[in-house]
Amino acid sequence: MIVQYRLKLKGPEGRPLSNTWAYRLYAWLLEQAPEEFAAFAHRQENRCLSQYLDGNVWVLNLLGREAAEVFGSVLEKTEKISLNNALMQVEESCCRVVEKPEDFLNRGRELHCLRSELRFRSPTAFRQAGRYAIYPETGLILQSLLAGWNQLYPEYLLEDGDMLAELKGGINI
């Protein structure tokens, strides 16, 4: 299950939000969740939440039923967010749900795309041999994406070596 929330925020004193607010919003969300789940969600190996700011719209992707329930219950009732003595109003919110992997795959087929584009909307780090990679290679990006997919949809594991090599060969940075 993938649930995407889009919250249109009115910044402090009506000012536009810069991307630097994204991590503070993420920290605020973790503070609203039960402590054990917040710690679980924050660990690097868990891929249950991704978020970024797109202008004044806070976009959150909740991956898996538990994240959707825990964080969704917080986001559904949020009207105001107070951060560092700054108050933000939620002007609008919407939610999209992809319940089953088949829905996700069928949506991709509907787009009739020969290419896909991946944008990193917030700082992204990759690790190799226990160290952060300054410049991630296509293999690290693909490995991260597939690990997230396999964690979310274990019934559709993507681990065929030939497929991975073909995907890696077709990725350009």
Labelled PLM ranges:
Residues 1-173:
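RNA-interacting cores
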